[in-house]
Amino acid sequence: MISSFHRPTVARVNLQAIKENVASVQKHIPLGVKTYAVVKADAYGHGAVQVSKALLPQVDGYCVSNLDEALQLRQAGIDKEILILGVLLPNELELAVANAITVTIASLDWIALARLEKKECQGLKVHVKVDSGMGRIGLRSSKAVNLLIDSLKELGADVEGIFTHFATADEADDTKFNQQLQFFKKLIAGLEDKPRLVHASNSATSIWHSDTIFNAVRLGIVSYGLNPSGSDLSLPFPLQEALSLESSLVHVKMISAGDTVGYGATYTAKKSEYVGTVPIGYADGWTRNMQGFSVLVDGQFCEIIGRVSMDQLTIRLPKAYPLGTKVTLIGSNQQKNISTTDIANYRNTINYEVLCLLSDRIPRIY
């Protein structure tokens, strides 16, 4: 989807806030712990290349989801370690090795396929994934991990790290978290040749379970200034939300009692009122279920009326504002604020999803 620079809808990304958020977390973790910045999914909608360059002096490496995301960073001149968190099949290994990209290997089946396809792993850097209870990818026993590490070394790979991921580190009930932690510790203790790097700490673990940090952390959502738990747990230190979303009024009119607005005529005016049109819609990631939510105009909350369309939404205004008047969808407007978590709560989802759904049709301004 092409970025639409010739309309007023933009996302503003504060790179300094991201740098300060990472620094705040680093102050609360032990010295010598390696920091990976998680910039998958275009840095959660903030711009992977721009964020990675901004954090270059502060972090030891980056985590991405797949090979294409890793190659994007290499092509942008990022020369620090890049770890792919997802599974890369053996037929893509040559690109990974050629670009010094570290891969995750999560099963003995992967080794079997590599051997079947006669793939060598000479020069390949690997982190092994352990499934301690997340249930997605990873090995489940020390025996399996030992066999995998031995097999990888036979094929010429350098096994640098081993890691896991917690399912409930952002929840108040830490029963499942502790079960996973003990599972992982026991598995690590059973390794015959433990890799140099051991990491399990995502954003939530880094800030609420710092006593469980091994020797590396993966900082994702906290880097962008958001609480991993939404609003369930209090942050131990302040963060700055790095992304704001704004647009402008492009049409203002008065409607009369009985007039309807939007697809399905789901909104009927009870009296005469001003309606403003804003050029953002579900194609931009502002989903249809945002009808009834409010945005900010002139420091006042204005309700979204009628269904959100693909490219536009409509809001009830307290008066007739001039065309071009600023509309804030995420961020501050005259001392009032709408957070990404406010939107997530309204949608009954998580703040991660709100950011990741913001499409590339919305230009990012830095």
Swiss-Prot record:
Q: Which CDD domains match?
A: PLPDE_III_AR
Keywords in UniProt for this one?
A: Isomerase, Pyridoxal phosphate
Q: Supply the Pfam families for this chain.
A: Ala_racemase_C, Ala_racemase_N
Pathway(s) this gene product operates in, as recorded in its UniProt entry: Amino-acid biosynthesis; D-alanine biosynthesis; D-alanine from L-alanine: step 1/1
Which SUPFAM superfamilies does its entry note? Alanine racemase C-terminal domain-like, PLP-binding barrel
The UniProt record lists the EC number as 5.1.1.1
- What is a GO molecular function of this protein? pyridoxal phosphate binding
Q: Which InterPro entries match?
A: Ala_racemase, Ala_racemase/Decarboxylase_C, Ala_racemase_C, Ala_racemase_N, Ala_racemase_pyridoxalP-BS, PLP-binding_barrel
Q: Which residues carry this modification: N6-(pyridoxal phosphate)lysine?
A: 40
By sequence similarity, the record places it as follows: Belongs to the alanine racemase family.
Function according to Swiss-Prot or TrEMBL: Catalyzes the interconversion of L-alanine and D-alanine. May also act on other amino acids.
Q: Could you tell me which PANTHER family the record lists for this protein?
A: ALANINE RACEMASE, ALANINE RACEMASE, CATABOLIC-RELATED
Q: What is this protein called?
A: Alanine racemase
Which source organism does the UniProt entry give? Streptococcus pyogenes serotype M28 (strain MGAS6180)
